[in-house]
């Protein structure tokens, strides 16, 4: 009984730590992205609040917290509020199946730096990723606004198309690793001595497309499309509720999907032991934020696709390539 209570308490502690870090890092990615955008556009970015504008996220949070919240006339209030939760929670839940490093011992206790080490981790990742679109759909429907509704429909169309491509892009990795466990996939790469990016470069490119589409990043941000829909599905939200949507979709989601990409294609925590026992955790964080940086950089360098082109690219180009990649991988795995 004591062992069960201890295990539950320790799991709860890991949940609090991971979720707090995700929200905190996600908030500070807003500052980093604005600095990056300023550098790309030959300006300084945030400079006023704190040295180098480092306290800008705190100022933004204070501003949003003190904003007046105006609910549109005719809005479905229960669904209106539930949409915020449905947008934020699935993005955070994605972090529960990510192994941040190898297990280690502290005294007689074996600690695994993952919240849910289950054999169907990737299946859960797909489930959590699919749930996030409901927050978008609920917000568009409940807001009683044509701009919000059109934005939510666009997001739903993108997710339906790219979830299929995402599933096929990951199938090749599953065939190579022989497991749906994220820990097992990392261990398979370490055992083979080769990261799956070298076996599955096409799958990684497909995954990158899907990651940008799922997180609503340029060139796939047609659900916001400021020139067409103001800010899209969350246009009728104010205060902290308004900030919760980009925090979930643009930042926490990008962190989670980048971390999953590291697990699938870049060997997870595998890397040279240059920092002693901390090396695995360093390499995992380094690889993850290298992908996050790449995603943010693309956002400020690429133009937006037209709405009609995005789903056509998925169904007519990416999906056939993904299916062909799975067939070739299956033949090679079966033959060798």
Swiss-Prot record:
GO molecular function, one term: oxidoreductase activity, acting on NAD(P)H, quinone or similar compound as acceptor
EC number in record: 7.1.1.-
Keywords: Cell inner membrane, Cell membrane, Membrane, NAD, Quinone, Translocase, Transmembrane, Transmembrane helix, Ubiquinone
Gene Ontology cellular component annotations, sorted alphabetically: plasma membrane
GO BP terms, alphabetized: aerobic respiration
Enzyme class: translocase
Disulfide bonds: none
Function according to Swiss-Prot or TrEMBL: NDH-1 shuttles electrons from NADH, via FMN and iron-sulfur (Fe-S) centers, to quinones in the respiratory chain. The immediate electron acceptor for the enzyme in this species is believed to be ubiquinone. Couples the redox reaction to proton translocation (for every two electrons transferred, four hydrogen ions are translocated across the cytoplasmic membrane), and thus conserves the redox energy in a proton gradient. This subunit may bind ubiquinone.
Assembly and binders: NDH-1 is composed of 14 different subunits. Subunits NuoA, H, J, K, L, M, N constitute the membrane sector of the complex.
HAMAP family named in the record: NDH1_NuoH (MF_01350)
Protein family: Belongs to the complex I subunit 1 family.
Protein name stated in the entry: NADH-quinone oxidoreductase subunit H
